[in-house]
């Protein structure tokens, strides 16, 4: 066995754990339905949906430094190993944010203290970014509960779907962003659109924040759109630090699908987010790349060449030589709180691979908190596995983010923010 790597099958531990219900449904420990596997294998024969065809692989060891030293303390992780891992992801996966100077300003363009029939205050904030005569505006929409003592914890969602999911008038409501239910739980809820920061298409990085901050010829480790959207989330966090209604120590970043990938990278880069929630983030998010199950490194880079840095493309079909895998991305969130969830029909996003990544990130979380331990088997359908600062559930159904998921997020937040 190569130094610094370990087989995932070796991680079998004995411990007590908690299963708590997302809803009233009870099921056995989750496995993909054979009929779902058969259907997807037939309709997408170029991709693997069979556990029997997952290749043998080993994962990079989280706790071995580049010099071969074993990490055993919080100081060693924070001062040595964490910076190493973060740099590996910048260089090989997400890219580096340019150091181009810029200015930012905040302006509340609309405020309604009687929103939601008096339950909340609506604030619409323009976050303006300027650099050398070029500018863009991130439109932040937020609701703050009126009947709760301030400052309050807040959720920030990265919206990848469009205005029908974040209507500030609340004439249009969506489970994807159930603002009323979140306000009723005593949390502030906010959202910005990824397209405000950078367009979700391959425009050779000419528009959005790339068109403002990029200089010269792009390097292989130049930031992609996911890193740009994560950067935008941090600019929203900059605003929260100025708003006396928001508890800046208790802000969660939330994303679905490509937004989930973005939330994970935002949480890795910006430690001000005290809770990171990735909903069905799949390949390039929480799912282990080495499993080659569902969407692969090759496919995601060919379909979405603007999402990651160019260096990521060299691992297409060659995942085993990656210096990282996604358990290392999840470990970058420690010692803050992390919640991962998946959907039973979304095998494209590899639910088992997401759970394995979370499980294999635990050695880092446990350096900080021995209570952060989830079982070595996936929880049953529609049940939560929660211990310490980590949580997981797999919901029945398709690729989406629903009220059922949000209730689980809030239950987890209740625990870690109490």
Where are these regions (language model features)?
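N-terminal pre-domain segments of enzymes
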Residues: 25-94
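Mobile cap/lid helix-loop segments that gate and shape the active-site cleft of serine hydrolases
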Residues: 278-329, 354-375
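Cap/lid segment of the alpha/beta-hydrolase catalytic domain
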Residues: 150-243, 285-291
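Conserved strand-to-loop "acid loop" that flanks and positions the catalytic carboxylate
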Residues: 334-349, 395-396
């Amino acid at each position: 066995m190569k130094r610094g790597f370990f087989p995932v099958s070796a991680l079998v531990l004995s411990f007590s754990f908690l299963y708590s219900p997302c809803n009233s449904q009870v099921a056995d420990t989750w496995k993909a339905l054979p009929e779902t596997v058969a259907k997807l294998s037939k309709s997408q024969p170029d991709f693997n949906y069979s556990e029997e065809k997952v290749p043998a692989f080993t994962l990079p060891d989280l706790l071995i430094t580049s010099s071969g030293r074993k990490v055993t303390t919080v100081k060693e992780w924070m001062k040595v190993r964490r910076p190493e891992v973060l740099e590996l992801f910048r260089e090989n996966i997400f890219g580096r944010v340019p150091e181009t100077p810029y200015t930012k300003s905040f302006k509340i363009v609309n405020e309604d203290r009687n929103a939601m029939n008096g339950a909340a205050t609506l604030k619409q904030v323009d976050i303006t970014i300027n650099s050398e005569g070029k500018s863009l505006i991130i439109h932040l929409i937020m609701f703050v509960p009126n009947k709760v003592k301030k400052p309050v914890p807040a959720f920030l969602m990265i919206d990848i779907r469009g205005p029908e999911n974040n209507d500030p008038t609340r004439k249009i409501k969506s489970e994807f962003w159930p603002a009323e239910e979140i306000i009723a739980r005593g949390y502030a809820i906010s959202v910005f659109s990824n397209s405000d920061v950078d367009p979700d298409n391959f425009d050779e990085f000419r528009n959005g924040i790339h068109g403002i901050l990029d200089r010269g010829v792009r390097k292989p480790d130049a930031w992609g759109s996911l890193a740009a959207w994560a950067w935008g989330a941090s600019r929203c966090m900059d605003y929260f630090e100025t708003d006396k209604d928001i508890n800046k120590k208790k802000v969660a970043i939330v994303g679905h699908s490509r937004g989930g990938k973005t939330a994970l990278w935002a949480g890795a880069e910006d430690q001000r987010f005290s809770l990171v929630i990735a909903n069905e983030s799949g390949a390039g998010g929480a799912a282990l790349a080495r499993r080659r199950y569902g969407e692969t490194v090759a496919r995601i880079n060919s379909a979405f060449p603007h999402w990651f840095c160019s260096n990521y493309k060299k691992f297409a079909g060659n995942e085993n030589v990656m210096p990282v895998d996604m358990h290392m991305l999840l470990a970058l969130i420690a010692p803050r709180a992390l919640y991962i969830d998946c959907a039973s029909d979304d095998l494209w996003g590899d639910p088992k691979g997401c759970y394995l990544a979370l499980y294999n990130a635990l050695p880092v979380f446990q350096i900080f908190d021995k209570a952060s331990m989830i079982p070595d088997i996936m929880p049953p359908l529609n049940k939560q596995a929660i211990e310490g600062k980590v949580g997981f559930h797999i919901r029945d159904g398709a690729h989406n983010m629903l009220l059922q998921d949000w209730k689980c997020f809030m239950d987890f937040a209740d625990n870690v923010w109490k």
